[in-house]
């Protein structure tokens, strides 16, 4: 059985957030403060059985309603029972799929939550709510708080507003009196049918383990706290219990044999450590070239327990050791995670009747080099299954593009923060929409391969710029800086120069393959591409001889915005029409290509720069036939000269790039969906709605 879905209401920014979980690994990605840690926090709170709710976790968006309802109760306008119905509740709902279990198989701790007698239903639904505990006593305390405020602040301009402030002050210190946890078994076929369950029933269903981002790896010399050693102690206590019992029987003779028994204990512990390390080698560490891991321990006679276990490091074939503080933080991080996984595996074995083991690993990439990050996420499920012998559901949150692009789309959940809430986008939905369209299916395959190879950071940016090649990738950051210094971004704060902008080098032949994905993620995107004039037969040419463009992205844009069918070729006049009819923007996307300046229409970035900086390149102002010789001049050298040569540092930026960067700078946060125009056979109309920063 598995946890298939989690729905959260009114917890921090998770106002109405649905998260579908993969049966093996779910990767949670998104920018900072996008709700990833909040998701973990409510899982940990509820599954650990915490009965109260913190005021800081109650959404700001719900507080005004709560204050208003309590004020009406105080004033006698509504009853306490009515108020309980009106107060927004924090809640989380779990859907557990047990369809893979045999009909006669014992469902263990899940049994109390299966209340639907329909044999065709294989979902158990658990609803956990923080119910209102509003009572006469609480209302009396709030009334006293209001009366006290009248004494201390008699000049308040508005009587009601001052009373609302008093209610807010009361709640900030007494919030644990207002809500208490309630657990229900819900009938999925008829949600109005439910049965009350105990919190202990919920705790029995899950074995939940959190490995937080703040794992504490620093080990100062001569410092008492040894974080990895502490985990090892807990593991080895279980691993050598039979040995400890043997010591207990010989307690009277223990002093005489203590040295001998310590050696045996050391052997037992190193056997267990060797088993763990054997599984850890899957992550590429330690190899024969690395310092080898050993465990050191002491037996304290007064406690009769194993104490002060820690790691030591040795060179292969040598007896000399070094302390654990001599290892790097990246490998320490990996080692500690693996030991915590082993500890979790032991918990699972102790609680075999629990239905679902659930591991939440927060930002495992800390201190790891990129290659180790990739290997880690590739093998974690296999390693953990090796520890337990069972499949474990794993949730990983990350800010690493190496980890994010190492798993298939179907395992990724994208947390996107809007102005007042967080939404979770299930990339399985994007994957599924591509399956019935051959072109989209090909684009999907390209996307995954490209993002894996390039370690694209689309999931973690505010905005994205798709560019032609290396020259644009090198120059765009400098051009953004120039526009910012010129005051062209002053309509926004922070400006584009301070926003998290990803630059993806993809080229005009492939940029259009990103369109559907960008639309799905809802990221403002600027496409900077080349107009690529060609004759009717596809030969490169100047504007006066151009009949069409060879740029696949521009052709796709024309078909979508001008509704040109695939059976009709895109003419160069159609490309010009995009500019004249203001059709360069489509939903979240905006495209820019070269425009005519100084009586010349450039065909590439290099030509556009040369055109607006003619004096730098000794080009006559009347010359309308010059071109960039890509055969004799390397594009990267052209760009580096602009960035490093003192004579070129004050170059001017072409207008099409300036216009595009200003558009991108001015984009606000948006609520998905927006109106996106596509060619007629796939045309869809959606409601445009924006949220201002």
Question: Where are the language model's segments positioned?
Answer:
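Acidic, Mg2+-coordinating catalytic modules of nucleic-acid enzymes
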Residues: 200, 447-466, 470-693
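Conserved nucleotide-binding/hydrolysis micro-motifs of P-loop NTPases
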Residues: 45, 98-101, 131-136, 215-218, ...
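Glycine-rich phosphate-binding loops of NTPases
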Residues: 57-248, 542-582
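Switch/communication elements of ASCE P-loop NTPase nucleotide-binding domains
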Residues: 1-48, 312-454, 658-693
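Short alpha-helical segments and helix-capping/turn motifs at coil-helix boundaries
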Residues: 73-80, 109-114, 184-201, 278, ...
